[in-house]
């Protein structure tokens, strides 16, 4: 039975990820006054499956100078971690109900850095290595703000368990009392998933694709799949933390409908940003985090820590 549950979680995620790729190409197409993929199947709906067949039937290239073990392990690790992050997410019932669910997500997502670092180093290419170093610095930096924002929300919910966040938001979304945190969280998730305007790791103009330049066929597809799975996961987590949906035992299907709708809207915002914004300069990216986000999040964390103490110390008004 646990294996069936695991498959029932993984298969829909992979299908959603495939259609997210198609949706992105369609949105980019219409934003640029063209059609996008519209040949394979009705309205191009079978395009993701055609791409998958093409990539996985091609011969994978292994550069002669690369470190083969790490070169093959890196993309596999990237997708494994991307799928593993879904286990504690309540939709409305998690696959594994962890008491430290948020801590698990934070710790596991930081492991994704290793797959990028290994891929860049094992490729034995200057472009790949520079792209990997950029991606690692960016991901580690933005994890700092993500952790502080999570701590601030934990002070409001009182537990590391993600299911508790749903109970906390029965009457009021956490987005309303903590909207500055929510805005910084959303921008940090863009940076964490290496998306526009923070896609410096894949800077086509200067790095010719970045850390995955030496990859082709199946391993390249695995990196792509991991990236898009992470996008959906991050938006699902954002929905759980800031836009919590009330769970009604009498009509559980309503929870799923609202939950999926919010996640789709956030994911569409990711794609819209991709079409509209240019790429940041690397120094601007780091300046935004260390000079702006970090002081702000620390100040807000102190505010959320001190508020309950201050209120509890006020004598009752008789």
Swiss-Prot record:
One Pfam match: NADHdh
Which GO molecular-function terms appear in the entry?
NADH dehydrogenase (ubiquinone) activity
Q: Which reaction does it catalyse?
A: a ubiquinone + NADH + 5 H(+)(in) = a ubiquinol + NAD(+) + 4 H(+)(out)
Its transmembrane ranges are: 2-22, 68-88, 100-120, 146-166, 171-191, 231-251, 253-273, 294-314
Recorded disease is: Leber hereditary optic neuropathy: A maternally inherited form of Leber hereditary optic neuropathy, a mitochondrial disease resulting in bilateral painless loss of central vision due to selective degeneration of the retinal ganglion cells and their axons. The disorder shows incomplete penetrance and male predominance. Cardiac conduction defects and neurological defects have also been described in some LHON patients. LHON results from primary mitochondrial DNA mutations affecting the respiratory chain complexes. Mitochondrial encephalomyopathy with lactic acidosis and stroke-like episodes syndrome: Genetically heterogeneous disorder, characterized by episodic vomiting, seizures, and recurrent cerebral insults resembling strokes and causing hemiparesis, hemianopsia, or cortical blindness.
* Keyword Translocase listed: yes
EC class of the enzyme, as a word = translocase
What's any one GO cellular component for it?
A: dendrite
> Could you describe the subunit structure of this protein?
Core subunit of respiratory chain NADH dehydrogenase (Complex I) which is composed of 45 different subunits.
Q: PROSITE patterns given for it?
A: COMPLEX1_ND1_1 (PS00667), COMPLEX1_ND1_2 (PS00668)
Q: Which family does it belong to?
A: Belongs to the complex I subunit 1 family.
Localisation per UniProt entry: Mitochondrion inner membrane
Q: Which HAMAP family match?
A: NDH1_NuoH (MF_01350)
One biological process GO term for this chain? Answer: response to hydroperoxide
Please describe what this protein does: Core subunit of the mitochondrial membrane respiratory chain NADH dehydrogenase (Complex I) which catalyzes electron transfer from NADH through the respiratory chain, using ubiquinone as an electron acceptor. Essential for the catalytic activity and assembly of complex I.
Q: How does it sit in the membrane?
A: Multi-pass membrane protein
User: Which superkingdom is the protein from?
Assistant: Eukaryota
Record note on what altering residue 4 to T does:
Might contribute to non-insulin dependent diabetes mellitus susceptibility in some populations
What keywords were assigned to this record?
A: Alzheimer disease, Amyloidosis, Diabetes mellitus, Disease variant, Electron transport, Epilepsy, Leber hereditary optic neuropathy, MELAS syndrome, Membrane, Mitochondrion, Mitochondrion inner membrane, NAD, Neurodegeneration, Primary mitochondrial disease, Respiratory chain, Translocase, Transmembrane, Transmembrane helix, Transport, Ubiquinone
- Designated gene of the protein: MT-ND1
Enzyme Commission code: 7.1.1.2
- Name the major location: mitochondrion
**Which effect does the record note for changing residue 30 to H?**
In LHON; uncertain significance; secondary mutation
Organism lineage reads as: Eukaryota, Metazoa, Chordata, Craniata, Vertebrata
What organism does the record attribute this protein to?
Homo sapiens
Task: Name it.
Answer: NADH-ubiquinone oxidoreductase chain 1
